[in-house]
């Protein structure tokens, strides 16, 4: 797992405007994925419930571009007593791509959806138990009627090297979270997960749960539509 941490407080303290575009800082990405065309057709996430399963959501409750009224609830599966808004910011960055809604600053792909913000990633260690946390978060999402799960997590190395995965284990059945992910569609939900950020390192391959059956594994491209060098290699949607 590798997480790219943005400048944590930039949207809180310095919300930069981009008057040349309604979508602000998100203009290039939403146009590349044709999300703007969906918006023009009236599809802005309304009536959908999305669960984000990730690391923390640092300062998301202070960023006014987020509509906290659209947050149905939060739950921390790593430390139930922790404040997910005081933890790592990767989940906040992921959510922002969908949920931000401030014209000329940034408008995400689903600004009118409802959200559950769930934390399963322990930023201070890398252990197999985090896949148990993730699996519990998936079951919780099912219990509260979620339509779509978005998760940008993946695992292949651990603090105990004897637990590290091997290429032959990328079969959608070996890793616990891959087995769990394969059942999500059976419950009527869509799971969208990142391919991984290991493309430039020695591993290179996609990371579980991206190898699961019946999920949408999404890669990464730059503004020019060319695959990014960090993108993990393997099957996507």
Predicted features, each with a name:
Residues 172-188:
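Catalytic-core regions built around general acid/base machinery
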Residues 54, 181, 196:
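Active-site glycine-centered loops adjacent to acidic/histidine catalytic or metal-binding residues
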Residues 131-134, 158-159, 164-166, 178, ...:
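Active-site-adjacent substrate-recognition loops and nearby beta-strands
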């Amino acid at each position: 797992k590798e997480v790219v941490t943005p400048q944590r407080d930039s949207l809180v303290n310095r919300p930069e405007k981009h008057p040349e575009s309604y979508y602000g800082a998100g203009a290039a990405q939403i146009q590349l994925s044709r999300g703007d065309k969906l918006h023009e057709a009236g599809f802005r996430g309304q009536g959908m419930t999305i669960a984000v399963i990730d690391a923390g959501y640092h300062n998301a409750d202070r960023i006014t571009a987020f509509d906290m009224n659209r947050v149905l609830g939060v739950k921390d599966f790593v430390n139930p007593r922790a404040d997910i808004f005081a933890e790592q910011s990767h989940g906040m960055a992921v959510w922002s791509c969908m949920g931000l809604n401030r014209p000329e600053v940034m408008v995400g792909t689903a600004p009118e959806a409802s959200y559950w913000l769930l934390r399963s990633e322990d930023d201070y260690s890398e252990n197999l138990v985090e896949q148990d946390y993730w699996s519990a978060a998936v079951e919780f999402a099912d219990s509260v009627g979620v339509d779509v799960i978005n998760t940008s997590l993946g695992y292949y190395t651990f603090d105990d090297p004897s637990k590290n995965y091997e290429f032959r284990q990328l079969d959608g059945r070996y890793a616990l979270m891959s087995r769990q992910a394969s059942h999500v569609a059976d419950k009527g939900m869509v799971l969208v997960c990142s391919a991984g950020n290991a493309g430039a390192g020695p591993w290179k391959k996609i990371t579980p749960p991206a190898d699961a059956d019946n999920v949408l594994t999404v890669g990464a491209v730059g503004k020019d539509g060319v695959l990014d060098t960090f993108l993990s290699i393997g099957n996507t949607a």
